[in-house]
Amino acid sequence: MGSLLWLAVAYVMGSIPFGLLFAKMFCGTDPRTGGSRNVGATNVARLCGTKVGVLTLVCDALKGAIPVAVALSISDSTVFHSLTALAALLGHLYSCFLSFKGGKAVATTVGVFLPLAFWPLVLSGIACLAVIWRSGFVSLGSLTLVTAMPAMLLLGGHWKLVPLALVVMVLVYWSHRENIGRLSRGEEKPWQKKHHDAAQGTDAGAAPEAAADAAHAGTVDCGCDCGCDAHKPSTEAAPSQETSDASAHGAEAPVAADEGDKRENEEHDNAPEASAAESKPEDKPAGKTVGKPASRSVAKPASKSAGKTGGKAADKSAGKSGKSSGQ
């Protein structure tokens, strides 16, 4: 009876969603709605930073290590130890606090093997870290950890724990089935890119808005994305200065043309009067400048010059005749 009660306690302890609690406490977010939508330490580190991720990793490991350590202190049965470890793992995978959903049980796996087989766990952990460092895929490193664990247990002489390690390997592979599919298709993102995308989450969310603003440059924003008539270009609603000037000139052109036609008609109607008026003034000046001046300038000077020449000639001839008679 006491053993069953302890298994229930181990399950409840494993069900505590430290990742969800810390994410809401330190960064006000729900890891189930961001990143990989998982409450595990890896996703919490993406969303809230490395410190919160490490804190989640430690607590998830402790909720597996503490129940197993207590089981070791109260019983020598390897079966009981293994069942306690499985209860804590199932609590993390299918949490009673999260509608029987949970994480991927990697940190809790580390916790349950920590008091059971320390050195095999260390060797498996080194292999895990080496794979993560070389490939950048945390999921691949986690799969390496649980795959290497049975072999390390055999090498370390912990053959009684091999069945537990095999069951844990199946559970962890099942929880990583989506990651395995992405790895096989080459679609899994390495840790560095995931961490960068999570850190730039705000900018990535603003990028589409900036693109939408750039796409709607020169438009009127109605506050919606409906593509309604309010998103017509502002050039249609408010014409530019050039178009307004062109329209103003276009409106003035017919008026100027009409005024030009009126002026031409008036000039055409007044043409006979203008010609008659011009002919009369021309006759009078012509009579004055041609008739009278011509008679004065021609007749009078001619008579004067003729009189002078005639008088001089008569005087000369009279003088000559006087001289001849005197002789």
Swiss-Prot record:
Reactions performed catalytically: an acyl phosphate + sn-glycerol 3-phosphate = a 1-acyl-sn-glycero-3-phosphate + phosphate
Residues that span the membrane, as ranges: 3-23, 52-72, 78-98, 112-132, 152-172
Topological category with respect to the lipid bilayer: Multi-pass membrane protein
One Gene Ontology MF term: acyl-phosphate glycerol-3-phosphate acyltransferase activity
Localization (cell): Cell inner membrane
Sequence ranges of Polar residues compositional bias: 237-246
Uppermost EC category: transferase
Entry EC no(s): 2.3.1.275
Domain of life where this protein originates: Bacteria
Regions of compositional bias (Basic and acidic residues) in chain numbering: 259-271
Region (Disordered) residue spans: 184-212, 233-327
Role of this protein: Catalyzes the transfer of an acyl group from acyl-phosphate (acyl-PO(4)) to glycerol-3-phosphate (G3P) to form lysophosphatidic acid (LPA). This enzyme utilizes acyl-phosphate as fatty acyl donor, but not acyl-CoA or acyl-ACP.
Family of this protein: Belongs to the PlsY family.
Record text on subunit structure and interactions: Probably interacts with PlsX.
NCBIfam families, A to Z: glycerol-3-phosphate 1-O-acyltransferase PlsY
UniProt name for this protein: Glycerol-3-phosphate acyltransferase
